[in-house]
Amino acid sequence: MKRPSGRAADQLRSIRITRNYTKHAEGSVLVEFGDTKVICTVSVENGVPRFLKGQGQGWLTAEYGMLPRATGERNQREASRGKQGGRTLEIQRLIGRSLRAALDMSKLGDVTLYVDCDVIQADGGTRTASITGAMVALADALKVIKKRGGLKGGDPLKQMIAAVSVGMYQGEPVLDLDYLEDSAAETDLNVVMTSAGGFIEVQGTAEGAPFQPEELNAMLALAQKGMTELFEMQRAALAD
């Protein structure tokens, strides 16, 4: 089996995490997984949604979108259609669920964190890149809240979160699929994990033939290997 990119089966794409990418947001990152590029920002606003009023905890929510020409052909803006598509809603809910697992909301205070992930170029794995990059932007936003005199109850960051795709490509498990691989893969799996080694989400779909238990185990092992590298990249980015 030869991957279109020439990478080894267990090799991530070239990954870059650029912090403080935009001027105004409390946390901002440009994350690049190969040719997939996503701007991730975290904005801090006082107050929480109505369903959390008086409960003494904060909240985090996420939105996701793609520029019209992030892909090979122009896509109509969802705003011009008047509604978000099902894929967009699914991905932004995944991002929100994943990042909430990083936080102790009771220590966040009366604050809402708005995570925005905007894909400026797509070449596969936009949701996993979004989660991995937004986690770094979230860590930076928490530092800003602390500098402003917040977080009196302690650090709400429990653990780091990252995500990566794995799949069965030409009968073999591979890590971090690009678009060419993703579009031809027999199985596509998105995995979200904590830096402590726990799984937050595993999304898997077979195309054509079902995948077998031993293939699932092989893909998860590959994802865990990739996560080790991603968490190290996040730590290195935050140490700069």
Swiss-Prot record:
<dbReference type="InterPro" id="IPR027408">
    <property type="entry name" value="PNPase/RNase_PH_dom_sf"/>
</dbReference>
<dbReference type="GO" id="GO:0000175">
    <property type="term" value="F:3'-5'-RNA exonuclease activity"/>
</dbReference>
<keyword id="KW-0819">tRNA processing</keyword>
<dbReference type="GO" id="GO:0008033">
    <property type="term" value="P:tRNA processing"/>
</dbReference>
<protein>
    <recommendedName>
        <fullName>Ribonuclease PH</fullName>
        <ecNumber>2.7.7.56</ecNumber>
    </recommendedName>
</protein>
<comment type="similarity">
    <text>Belongs to the RNase PH family.</text>
</comment>
<comment type="function">
    <text>Phosphorolytic 3'-5' exoribonuclease that plays an important role in tRNA 3'-end maturation. Removes nucleotide residues following the 3'-CCA terminus of tRNAs; can also add nucleotides to the ends of RNA molecules by using nucleoside diphosphates as substrates, but this may not be physiologically important. Probably plays a role in initiation of 16S rRNA degradation (leading to ribosome degradation) during starvation.</text>
</comment>
<comment type="subunit">
    <text>Homohexameric ring arranged as a trimer of dimers.</text>
</comment>
<dbReference type="InterPro" id="IPR018336">
    <property type="entry name" value="RNase_PH_CS"/>
</dbReference>
<keyword id="KW-0694">RNA-binding</keyword>
<dbReference type="InterPro" id="IPR020568">
    <property type="entry name" value="Ribosomal_Su5_D2-typ_SF"/>
</dbReference>
<dbReference type="InterPro" id="IPR002381">
    <property type="entry name" value="RNase_PH_bac-type"/>
</dbReference>
<dbReference type="GO" id="GO:0006364">
    <property type="term" value="P:rRNA processing"/>
</dbReference>
<dbReference type="Pfam" id="PF01138">
    <property type="entry name" value="RNase_PH"/>
</dbReference>
<dbReference type="GO" id="GO:0009022">
    <property type="term" value="F:tRNA nucleotidyltransferase activity"/>
</dbReference>
<dbReference type="GO" id="GO:0016075">
    <property type="term" value="P:rRNA catabolic process"/>
</dbReference>
<dbReference type="InterPro" id="IPR050080">
    <property type="entry name" value="RNase_PH"/>
</dbReference>
<dbReference type="Pfam" id="PF03725">
    <property type="entry name" value="RNase_PH_C"/>
</dbReference>
<dbReference type="InterPro" id="IPR036345">
    <property type="entry name" value="ExoRNase_PH_dom2_sf"/>
</dbReference>
<dbReference type="GO" id="GO:0000049">
    <property type="term" value="F:tRNA binding"/>
</dbReference>
<keyword id="KW-0548">Nucleotidyltransferase</keyword>
<dbReference type="InterPro" id="IPR001247">
    <property type="entry name" value="ExoRNase_PH_dom1"/>
</dbReference>
<keyword id="KW-0808">Transferase</keyword>
<keyword id="KW-0820">tRNA-binding</keyword>
<feature type="binding site">
    <location>
        <begin position="125"/>
        <end position="127"/>
    </location>
    <ligand>
        <name>phosphate</name>
    </ligand>
</feature>
<dbReference type="InterPro" id="IPR015847">
    <property type="entry name" value="ExoRNase_PH_dom2"/>
</dbReference>
<keyword id="KW-0698">rRNA processing</keyword>
<feature type="binding site">
    <location>
        <position position="87"/>
    </location>
    <ligand>
        <name>phosphate</name>
    </ligand>
</feature>
